[in-house]
Amino acid sequence: MRKLLCAGVAGALMLAGCVGTPTSLDGSTGAPSFGALQEMCGSPVDYGPDALAVYSTFFDAYVALKRNGLSKERFCGFQAAIAQRHTAYATNPGPQTQSAWANFLLDQRAQALSWRAAVDPTLRAG
């Protein structure tokens, strides 16, 4: 089960690299830093070793926000929900909560990619 989760996270990260997601928390040309994305909605949260995966998720939602496919309220609510789940995981780490956190984050990543794909022609087939 643990190998399957790791494979899923690795697959999501590889996919993130293919769709133009920054590979550093510092951002890049046209991509705000992870801290800047978090500050759009409040105080930054320390995601520890999950920071890059969370950043990829936030960045895809940010692209949808910038292209008018997502409201700022929904973007900030999305960030808040992820922060809340991460806090619950960090408060009580263990195999079950790690699995629940990984599954939740993968679901959120898929949602963010869906929002981005709706407004970003580089993610559409064809």
Labelled PLM ranges:
Residues 19-22:
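Bacterial signal peptide processing site
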Residues 26-52:
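Post-signal peptide N-terminal segment of mature Sec-exported envelope proteins
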Residues 31, 48-56, 69-76:
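Soluble non-cytosolic domains of exported or imported proteins
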Residues 59-63:
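Amphipathic alpha-helical segments within well-ordered protein domains
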Residues 66-126:
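Compact alpha-helical subdomains of small soluble proteins
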